[in-house]
Amino acid sequence: MASYASEVKKELTSIEVHPEHAKAELAAFLRMNAVLSRHDGQMSLDIVTENPAIARRIFSLIKTAYGFDPQLIVTRKMKLKKNHQYLVRVAQMVSEIMADLEIYSPKKGFITGVPDKIKYSEQRSMSYLRGGFLASGSVNNPETSRYHLEIYCTYANHSQDLQEIMNKYFDLNAKVTARRSGSIVYLKEAEKIGDFLHVVGAVNAMLAFEDLRIMRDMRNSVNRLVNCDTANLRKTAGAAAKQVEDIELIDKKQGLEPLPEKLASLARFRLQHPELSLKELAEQVPDGPISKSGVNHRLKKLHEIAENLR
């Protein structure tokens, strides 16, 4: 069974985009996952993934943005012998693509942050976030786990740029923290995770997320009510047991007849009905109904008498 995160990514790979937005999404993929290699004396950009849908997505983005088909090489992992690896190799226009996507320039070298033309465009930022999530993002199943969505970045300034566009344009309250030779930008609030899914275009996943979140919150509310009721029942039962103990002591030491009639009446009724709450006692006592405070006052009197007899 596919994970929730896999279902989200599968939906994202089916979104059709304009060539300029394809470039923004591709810029995130290449910046976060590509390796610059040399084969047969020629430079290439290699992106490796185990997800066939993501491999097809990268292939499609390159074709949409630059008009040619990259190489797609499928290999089988040696250790497991059942999982395939997909290598998308860009072996032409490498320098032009890296310059166009602002991944590398002769003056600046490798550029690790989000390019300004993306950072200052809300529409391109949406596509860049989609590429970033597909490249190295994950989201927990809202039904079974704590709410958490994250995107891993190798470079701290890249995660800070992602945080900036997430908060500036989409009010996602994203946070950044250091993580294993890199950092992550993450969301913890259920509402903000739903908003992020909508921003990057995973509308069906967002609706499923909201349904699961609502069901989970309802279950939690019911559990809290049940726990509260159980605690109240225990409290009532404990108080009733102490009251019965007091009355039985009075009955054993001196009997109930010497008591004032109202106290004796309540004492006998409590012995007969140890399961009743204070409210129920007040409503059903033979000389009632009386107020809860009235019942409480009589029970305190009985307790004082029992204490004097101990």
Swiss-Prot record:
Biological process, per Gene Ontology: cell division; regulation of sporulation
DNA-binding region coordinates: 277-310
Transmembrane segments: none
UniProt keyword list: Cell cycle, Cell division, DNA-binding
Keyword tRNA processing found: no
Disulfide feature: none
GO molecular function (one): DNA binding
Record has GTP-binding as a keyword: no
Free-text function comment from the UniProt entry: Involved in cell division and chromosome segregation.
NCBIfam families: DNA_bind_WhiA
Family of this protein: Belongs to the WhiA family.
Record's protein name: Probable cell division protein WhiA
Record organism: Lactobacillus delbrueckii subsp. bulgaricus (strain ATCC 11842 / DSM 20081 / BCRC 10696 / JCM 1002 / NBRC 13953 / NCIMB 11778 / NCTC 12712 / WDCM 00102 / Lb 14)
Taxonomy of the source species: Bacteria, Bacillati, Bacillota, Bacilli, Lactobacillales
Gene: whiA
